[in-house]
Amino acid sequence: MKFIHGLTAGVSLAIVVSCSASKPYSGDEIPNGGVGGGGGGFISGSGGSATGGGGGCTSSTQCTPGYTCDNGTCVAPEVETNRGLGDAPPVATPRYVYALNPTAASVARIDPTTLQIEAVPVGPHPVGLAALPAEDAAVVLSLDDGSLSVLDSATLPTKVTRVALQRQYGKLTLSPDGKFAAAWPDPALAPASGAEGIFALVDLAKVRAGTTGSVQERAGGYRITNVIFRTQAGVSTALHVFAKSTVSTFDLVTGAALPARLALPASMSADVRSREVVASADGRIIMLRSTVAPELASFDGTRIDTVPLPEIATDLDLVPDGTAAVAALRSSGSVAYIEVPADLITPAGIDTISLGDGGVVGQIALPPQVPGTGMFALVYSTVTDAETFARIDLPSGVVTRYALEKKVDEIALSPDGRSALIIHKADPATTAVDPYEAAVDRDQGFSVFDVNSGFWQLQRTGSTRPTRFAFSPAGGFVGVALRDDALRRFQLMAVNLTSLVSTTLPLASTPLFMGTVPQAPGVTPHRVFVSQDHPAGRISVIQLDTGQVRTATGFTLNGEID
């Protein structure tokens, strides 16, 4: 049944504490969508101007693509972090962390317990790195020689099996069961040898067995943007390749060379730079968000349907079990709650949940897993001056707003959904009269939020901002990396998410990436790793609960422990 919610349950306040800190790392940002990350995160810059793209308007069609018409003004798209940067971050397996060393054409296999390092040779200029599921193995894509390497560390030294891909590719996607890899062109660059839409489908079982026919080139359409594997009962059965105006489905069971191909709705191919594609973990549910028309599209593997919305959505996310989608409707300050598949078949059943308090909904943050206490969304905007965010219980639509002391740049929820990290942005043009409040506005910083109680705590970081973060595997702690290049000050803040208290720990050099170290018997579950800028390669393993920092330097040497 379709209905409109607008229930506000209250406001939470908190106490401000101060601390000094360091300088930011500027990274890639993308408007209207992005690539989901793992245990770690990348923190974007401040969202930019809230207006522009055409000035006055009566409809979003009068605005620059990606902008929406809000109250007669073309408003900029929300800024959502792109966690998939050009340089592949390290990845973790049950026992090891693997990190690329592009200049030395190698991968460092690091034991996070002993910090022993093994330099594993791969093809020149490695650009892609992914861990195989549930085993100590990884796959590496190398650009210069167009090769793919499988690293097997079940026994040491690591066994390397390399295969040629016939051409250069910049992107790597693994199937959830680890049976296949897809190497495909970087959508931001011209394809190698002008081969538009050609990608390589690699049978990893054949690669590891040393049999022939492990690499098959396939035609995926013009301008590939997304590659998604579909699994059934834990087995990969199909590969969906989204291009500018088509989606091609390749049958992994029969191995047919030609796909089943469908045309995408015109609204989904009008601006491929900003359209968003989201999928459930098994690839069973795939949805697309247009930035030029008030509609979504759904793809179930065989057909595409459009789903009308009352306005252009500024964000789209699937709940973890794929049973519903949540779309941000910024102009009306509401979200659309779409039950899957019922509301895809009968869009009249879509629920519209209004904040009811004048708040803005530009971005949505959902828990990585469905909480035992029920699903909810944290909603906020990156292009307004609001120093608030709201929780929406789903599907009931109960809204609780929380007042903060600073503007919101990003919100990320912990693996257990009990805590959230709120990254703030500075306001150098603050008009606050109180000198203390003005200083808080000008500072960078972050807040940690306890979902159940509604309590939050601000951590100020002075004139610089946080750059990376990673939650511990089971929740309970989060690490936030800070940097100040001018002062050569590099730190990590370990935050206890139970007490909301931060502890500052030293880092040896500039933090680049962060990630989670998987839990292991007899070892603290609160370990994260931080890769750092160093000529020979450097990585630190931090125990967030004890504050122990252990650093390994020298990916191309035998390695030395600091």
Segments (PLM) and residue ranges:
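Short coil/turn segments that connect the beta-strands within blades of beta-propeller domains
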Residues: P94-R95, E135-D136, D177-K179, G234-T237, ...
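Repeated scaffold domains used in trafficking and secretory/extracellular systems
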Residues: T81-P89, P124-P133, R167-P176, A219-T231, ...
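A short beta-strand motif characteristic of beta-propeller blades
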Residues: L115-P121, P157-V163, R208-A219, A256-M268, ...
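Ser/Thr-rich, Pro/Gly/Ala-heavy low-complexity intrinsically disordered linkers and tails
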Residues: I15-E78, D87-P89
